[in-house]
Amino acid sequence: IGNHELYNMSVAQDVYEHFVPHWGDRYLTSNVHITLPGTTQSRPIGHRYTRFTTKNQRLTIQAYGVLFDFQLGAPGITVQDPKAMVKEAWFQASLRASSDVDAFVIAGHMPVTGYDGWDAIHEAIRSVWPTTPILMLGGHTHVRDCRMLDSHAMALESGRYLETVGWMSMSNVSVPTFSRRYIDANPRNYAFHAGLVHAGHLSTPRGRFVRATMDAMARAWNLTDVYGIVPRDYYLDRAPYGDPSALLTLMSEHILPDVVRSSFPARANASSLIIMNSGSQRFDVFAGAFTKNDQYIVSPFRDAFLFVPDVPWYVARRLVHRLNELGAVHNEQPGAVHPAQGDADPIFHQYLRHAFYSYWLNRLSPTSTSSTQSPVPSGRPASARRLEELLEQVGTDGSMAEALPHLVGGSRGRSPSLGYVTADSCSGLGDDTVHTPIPYSDEQPDYIAAQPVPLPSSDHDHVDVIFADFIAQSILSLLNTYDARRHYTMADVSVWGNATTESLYSSFAQLHWRLDSMDSALHDMDRAATFDGYPPLAPFDTYAGDPYAPVTAPRLVFQ
């Protein structure tokens, strides 16, 4: 189980009452408990541990499912620290329940690196089983990572959002050899590793049934409805805030003013400041058709917009700056003492940053061994500034581009495609496909704002402060900090129109991304993609022949 199932009691209760009975002892929640409404008994949501025998080699596996010490669950949810869990009588008894265990498997929603919960579990198992292999499957921080806790224990974390399929394998239980791969999740890679000639040969009757069912559900929920044609790519992390290609720039300068401000005609004549937490945005928006499905991918949270009317400008204008100084609010459960706990974004961003800068700095300065850089006034490492300056020069100076062709990219065959580039602490190559790292910019604020238009001419002018409901308590706290003449409470807060963070893009797309001939525009984009070497794949069920025919030059088949 992960932290996202635990913020809301109705979700956790649904897991307990419907999901767990279906999966039985295969659903493991070793340290997560629930007290159902109207009861006083705390019980595990799922099973604490299980034992099973593998089909082919008849190995006996003992498995647990562990969550990090998450403290922001709904009332009635308790998560025990793994360091305390391993001291429990039931856990110690489980380690001694049988003398026949070939390997331990721990499915843990916990970071592989930088979290001592794994070490506590490892030490507890080793106190009873000193050499039995332990396979640990981590998560939560969205990165590709691997760590060997000893010669018989590997921990693997496999990215996020099903972008990565993590493959951990072990041979020879007595003297184990571990290996791992981070496989980009797409049918072509699946076919390659299955030894198939073409991805279409993955098609099976059951798979076609599942696909048809999913297509029917998508149609029933109108997920394929096209709201508009996005004219360009907008990036969540690749471009600095303020750049026209940055998603947060699009949001603050265009979407919030055009969609949110206009959603409440009753206050149309009032000057307003709109504030939103950037963490509500989860992915890039790419050029092309923008569908209802894309809306859920990019902005999945349904936060309403609230407002406090008639706030002095000398108070309102300080809010966004101070919010960014304080950092992102990740959950506002009453009584929370660790507001950032449960948030994976900072570690994931650090992973992207390290991959991007390390890759290019190694190519620019292969003799450089410095791993630390003194900060510059902007707060960015000097190496990052130097890299950005070089990349900019290469883009504008033809002679530099010729001297440093590996920095130019963009032409097929000269540079690997963009993707994850991983450096973990396990031996050997982890990434299954060679990539150029995805560009990354540190300059992303935790909070963004659409300023009043025009800006107030005096500090004593008044504005409506509009904000996503997720940050209501933070806004009220700061209003009370900066306005000594007034005490703000939730009684001063009202709902602003009918816009939600989930509906922002669909509304904006219908205002600005609609074309007279949508079908013609989509057809032209398909033709352009085909011309660039990326034709649409044929349907899976159109391929004939033996799916297990010998594979010759398989990687070439997939290009």
Give the ranges of each region predicted by the language model.
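Short secondary-structure transition/capping segments
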Residues: 16-18, 143-153, 180-195, 319-329
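Acidic, metal/ion-coordinating pockets
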Residues: 1-177
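Binuclear metal-dependent phosphoesterase catalytic core
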Residues: 29, 33-56, 153-243
